[in-house]
């Protein structure tokens, strides 16, 4: 492990005196492992009062197994149109890797992968493949809000495979749907904090630490002295407020009441218990999760397509009926009653709709008002839902073309002009008279 990853002071600054959302069993393993690295002589549970010596801490760690080996982390994959985002190990605010790395996953990496998947046209849905005991509070609520935002763009499902506790439960709660395996552990909706006191150990080593500060609360919770009661009460208030915020978020995401969430008292649930508690929706085998989600997305798509087709059919039928009424202007009441009582087949409805549409178009193009306004009449006829009556009113108010106006004026002039002189041969009497005229 690199020196940067073994920066123990930095790790201690994030692990102590900061609220953590960790599953209890993992928290014991975590602090036992950290105790050996930081020289902590004992661990004390503030609630139960139980203490572990350094030797007992190491024994507890040994029973839990060695976690220094390589962790299998899956890369970002798109499987059957579903983006699979692994979320494993301890959740931390930031890492340099988008993927789970060295036993931890960064909230920043989860957000970045979510945003990429949401904008990927090849992705129909997103599956968070979760195996995490939780982690830092810092960044957790923002990450959960991003999940809730993305689920409005594309379905985001969470799979507890085989754990999403504490901060992991917060993220899973923000998903559209939550799947659990039969042995998955979920829940632990609570907050914890650890305080370390090196004062006695430093005193034995002859080391004296002097803190020089300004501001009465500047060194609250420092690791070189006993935790005063008033400081502990302040930290406890922070824990209670954070837990309340945690419960409110889970309530907003899942629909459970805040009190129901608080009543879990940070309990951990397994498999079906999580469904009974309202923290999960479906029990699945982890290998079937992709298929289950794909089938659900396909069924949803079919329902949406069917709904659109039904609406379009209804709209066409209503439009055709209205158009036919406009053309004929008279619809006997008995005919409407019979139509309501009868259930015509689809072909009859289509035939009636086509006939009504043809009548509507021809009624607009051939009406008296369309003369001299042919282009406008064509546009009106192409307008969906435009009735003959409305089109005639619009055309009547519109000016005619210049050619139509000239033709109309000439017609009026010809109607008012005197009758033309008739051409023909003169009568025979007139001819005779002309011939008899003396010269």
UniProtKB/Swiss-Prot annotation:
Outcome, altering residue 166 to A: Complete loss of protease activity
Gene Ontology cellular component terms for the protein in this record: host cell cytoplasm; viral capsid
A single BP term in Gene Ontology: proteolysis
Domain of life: Viruses
Stretches assigned to coiled coil: none
Primary role: Assembly protease promotes icosahedral procapsid assembly. Autocatalytic cleavage may release the capsid scaffolding protein. The protease domain catalyzes the cleavage of the capsid scaffolding protein after complete procapsid formation. Assembly protease and cleavages products are evicted from the capsid before or during DNA packaging. Scaffolding protein Nu3 promotes icosahedral procapsid assembly. Acts by binding the major capsid protein gpE and multimerizing in interaction with portal dodecamer, thereby placing gpE in a context facilitating icosahedral procapsid formation. Cleaved by capsid assembly protease C after capsid completion. The cleavages products are evicted from the capsid before or during DNA packaging.
The name this protein goes by in its record: Capsid assembly protease C
Originating organism: Escherichia phage lambda (Bacteriophage lambda)
């Amino acid at each position: 492990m690199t020196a940067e990853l073994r920066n123990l002071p930095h790790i201690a600054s994030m692990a102590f005196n900061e609220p953590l959302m960790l599953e209890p069993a993992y928290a014991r393993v975590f602090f036992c492992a950290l105790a050996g690295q930081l020289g902590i002589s004992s661990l004390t549970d503030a609630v139960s009062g139980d203490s572990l010596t350094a030797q007992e801490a190491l024994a507890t760690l040994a029973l839990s197994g060695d976690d220094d080996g390589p962790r299998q982390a899956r890369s970002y994959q798109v499987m059957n149109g579903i983006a699979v985002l692994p979320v494993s190990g301890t959740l931390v605010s930031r890492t340099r890797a988008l993927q789970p790395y060295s036993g931890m996953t960064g909230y920043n990496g989860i957000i970045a992968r979510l945003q990429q998947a949401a904008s990927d046209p090849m992705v129909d849905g997103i599956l968070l493949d979760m195996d995490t005991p939780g982690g830092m509070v810092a960044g957790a609520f923002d990450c959960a809000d991003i999940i809730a935002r993305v689920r409005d763009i594309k379905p985001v499902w969470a799979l507890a495979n085989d754990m999403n506790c504490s901060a992991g439960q917060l993220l899973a709660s923000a998903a559209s749907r939550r799947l659990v395996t039969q042995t998955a552990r979920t829940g632990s909706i609570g907050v914890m904090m650890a305080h370390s006191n090196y004062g006695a150990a430093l005193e034995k080593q002859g080391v004296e630490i002097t803190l020089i500060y300004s501001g009465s609360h500047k060194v609250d919770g420092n690791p070189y002295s006993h935790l005063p009661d008033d400081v502990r009460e302040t930290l406890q208030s922070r824990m209670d407020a954070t837990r309340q915020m945690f419960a409110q978020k889970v309530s907003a995401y899942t629909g459970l009441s805040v009190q129901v969430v608080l009543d879990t008292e940070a309990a951990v649930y397994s498999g079906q218990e999580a469904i009974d508690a309202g923290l999960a929706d479906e029990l699945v085998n982890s290998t079937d999760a992709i298929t289950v989600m794909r089938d659900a997305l396909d069924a949803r798509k079919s329902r949406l397509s069917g709904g659109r087709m039904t609406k379009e059919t209804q709209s066409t039928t209503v439009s055709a009926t209205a158009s036919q009424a406009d053309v004929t202007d008279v619809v006997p009441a008995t005919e409407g009653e019979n139509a309501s009582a009868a259930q015509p087949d689809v072909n009859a409805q289509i035939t009636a709709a086509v006939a009504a549409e043809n009548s509507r178009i021809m009624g607009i193009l051939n009406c008296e008002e369309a003369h001299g306004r042919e282009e406008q009449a064509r546009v009106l006829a192409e307008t969906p839902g435009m009735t003959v009556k409305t089109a005639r009113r619009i055309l009547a108010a519109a000016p005619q073309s210049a050619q139509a106006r000239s033709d109309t004026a000439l017609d009026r002039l010809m109607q008012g002009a005197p009758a033309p002189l008739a051409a023909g041969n003169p009568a025979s009497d007139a001819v005779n008279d002309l011939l008899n005229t003396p010269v």
